[in-house]
Amino acid sequence: MTAFRWMAAAAACVALAASGARTDELMQKSGLNAQIAQFEKLVLRGVEEGIADSVQNRRGKDLTAEERAQLRSVVSSSFNTQRLRGEVRASLGKTLSPADEAAVLAWLDTDLGRRIAAIDVKYAEITVTMPERQLVGQVSDARKGLTETRVALLRRLGSALALGEASTRTITSILTSIMYGVMSSLDLSVADVDLIKRGLEARRDNIAHAMRQGAVARYAHQYKSLEDEALERFVNFVESPTGLKYSDATAAALEQAISHAALDFGRQFGEISKARKQSGQGQSAR
């Protein structure tokens, strides 16, 4: 699964993603519920692309029909939409006060708030369905010809949402959780996982910097339909105390929920890998 696709999906959720019915209303109106539903598709596509790449480069063999069905079942189980929503809901409920929730809901009930939520939901779908080369190309093109005013607004948005840091934490957590899960299922030492994790941590600043640099282009692409005046009002909300607290709470909730799902996926996928390896050894012995 590519870092670019995860970055786009995670950032779309954080842009506007918290007790009982009010939290449910918040997640529904913000589009967060709809965006979380895309994660299962995102993971399945990423894993299948990774396997296809391994086969093409002769580093591995393709999955059988039975193994592919098992993979889909594991992804569906680990990244179950209702479970992810439940974890995010619980986390937001602990972090946001009723006053925080009321303030965000008031924003979401404005014409601009509804417009932003619709854009975010649509963009989350695009990050899953659009071929990556096409998506990267469109994001790159979106950066061209922007006015200084537009660039300044997009930089403020990226800074307020801490895009680089939030996405880097999520990506590092996902990769580490999956690797740990796979290795624990294969009864292997976690020393290799720790080594890889340290390598990712060492590159964290560079990864975050690269993502911050790309924030202008990515948000230019995502919010290209917004006029400068509307974009500025959106940025002003995100930069407000309520907006900052909400985006931080959403990023943390998503990171936690996705990490748990990734760890579970890694363990189950490891079991499939172990069975596959044993099957191959059995056939070789004949």
Whereabouts are the PLM-identified features?
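Second-shell loop/turn segments in exported
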Residues: 25, 72-79, 88-92, 103-106, ...
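An acidic-aromatic pocket/loop used at catalytic or ligand-binding sites
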Residues: 20, 24-37, 42, 133-174, ...
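Extended amphipathic alpha-helical interaction segments
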Residues: 122-224
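A cross-kingdom marker for long, charged
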Residues: 197, 205-286
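Hydrophobic h-region of N-terminal signal peptides that target proteins for export
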Residues: 8-19
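Outer-membrane beta-barrel domain signature
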Residues: 119, 124-132, 136-139, 143-144, ...
